[in-house]
Structure formats: structure tokens, C-alpha cells
Amino acid sequence: MNRVYLDHNATAPLRAEARDAMVAAMDVVGNPSSVHGEGRAAKALVERARAQVARAFGADGADIVFVSGATEAAALACAGRGLVGADIEHDAVAAWIDPVLPVDAAGQVGVADPAGSVLQAANSETGVVQQLPQGLAVVDATQAFGKLPVAFNWMGCEMALVSAHKLGGPKGVGALVIRQGTELAAQIRGGGQEMGRRSGTENVIGIAGFGAAADAAVRDLADGVWAPVEEFRNILEKAIEAAAKETIFVGKSGVRLPNTACFAVPGWKGETQVMQMDLAGFAISAGSACSSGKVRASRVLRAMGYDDTVASSAIRVSLGPSTTQDQVMRFAEAWEKTYRRFRARAA
């Protein structure tokens, strides 16, 4: 069976540029904190990647603090600050905020006090792109970076979260981007690495891959690689709607990530669809979240006003630059077959 990967919002395939950079970094033996030649060589790789990420993210002049991923970046940026946000934020951010900000039916968040608020640039589940006000305390750019022309310096925020593996870099590395002059106490203390914000020997191999992936992702964005992806996403949604008229498409009326389709057939459990499509050779995600073996209705969709029947029935199909129209149509055909079986059983 030739499997088709349609879960790019969960993680993107490793880019060749990132792999090459990581393989080359494996031969650099030094610790970046060491002053000898080997240490300086490792330090040079880290600083090169720091410059690559800063350039790709439009963050010239900002501090790029390398961490283990966007989850750690969220904790470092948000913990203990009394920040507010909305109930559509990723779990890694939601753990540190008071989810009091209103969300409308289109998934847009109302922000009264940007300086005390956290807001995502784009939602990983629905693809909805936020209208970011200036002066936010923290922007979660994890899903937007590499798919949209986001830039730290025009977002006007204090800090932003980014992750390597969402744009074709390795898993286990990300960055907290901090406006210069911002005070931020370290959570992990020790050797004072990463400008004193995050101690511990840097993941040189992963960081090298991150820098290369960021470079490649922004180059591809400028070359228009996401335009056909958006076209294929729209073709998919038309095929799904033709097969099942009752399908609800989440966020479709507004601006979305070009690769993301989130839709629900009320009453047809999202996790059931994920398993059925997996058996058919397609990797997708449920709109509902799994935690400790328990499945609950998507709080993102509930925050947008959908009831539990819809919120527990949603699935997410997220494409990538390598996705073909043939793969999209094969998925639509396989989904329609499983949908017809669902309707036959429900009759």
C-alpha cells in the first residue's frame, strides 16, 4: 500500500536541506561553550542557525533563544505572568493562560489588552489566521511560520514561539524570539547558555537542521509553493461537499492557512474516521483531542460555538508542498466510501 501523508500540521517531513545540515553537524565534535577550536566550530554552527532563523522570521535585532520546541518556548514566555488568551490556543499555551478572551463563530479572538495577552497567528486545528493587533505579549507563530509571510518585527509583539519540525526541520528544537531589552528570567539554570535565558549545552545538530529548514521554508514561500497546495485543498473540500452535503467546513468563510481543511459530518466521530482512513492508507488527524487515552470534543470548535456533536466529529486534513492532486482525489474517494458505509449503518 502506498500511504499518503496528510497530517503536515502535526509535523512536516524532514527537508533534504535540514538533513544535509544535520549530517554535516554530526562531524563537529566540540561543545559550543568551549573556547578551543572544536568548541568554536560548534558555536559557529549555532550562530549561523540563529542568523538563519532571525532572517527567515523577519527578526533582525531580536534575540533568538534556542529551546527544545514551541512547548518549552511557551512555558518560558508565559509561565507566571498572568497572561490572558482564548480557548482556541494550543495546549502548550493554554496551560499558562487564563482563557477569558472571546472567540467569534469565525474563530477570531477579541483582544482588549494586547500587552497582557497571548494570541496564535494561525490555528493548527482549523487553519484560521488571526488578525494580530500590535503590542501582544506573546504570539504563537508555530503553525504560521513557513506557511505565511509572518515577520516578528512587523507583528510588534514582545515574544514569539516557533518550532523546527512544523516547517521541515527536526523534532525537538524550537526557539523563543524575544524583542531586545525584554526582561525574562530563565527557568532552566546552570551554565548560562542562550544569553542566560536557557542553560544547557545546545542541541547543535538539531539547531543546524532548524536553521537550514527555516531558510528553505521561506525561500519556498517566496517561490509560491503554497499556491497549488491551497488549490488542492479547495478541490478536496469541493469533493467532500459533493459526497456529503451535510458536511460542516470550519473556518472556510475567513482567511485560513493554505493547506488546512477542517470539516465534520455531525455524528460521525472524528477518531473513527482517523482510524478508518489510516487503514485505507491515509494519515490525518481528528479535530478532537486525545489525552491519557480519553477522547473529548475539540475545545477549539466549542469555543467557536459548535456543539459537542460537531466538535467531536471534526477531522483535519493538512497538506504539504509534496502533496499531489492525485493523492487528494484518492483521499476524497476513500473518504466517500467510508462515509457511505457510515450512512448505511446509521440508516
Each language-model region and where it sits:
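Pyridoxal 5′-phosphate
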Residues: 1-347
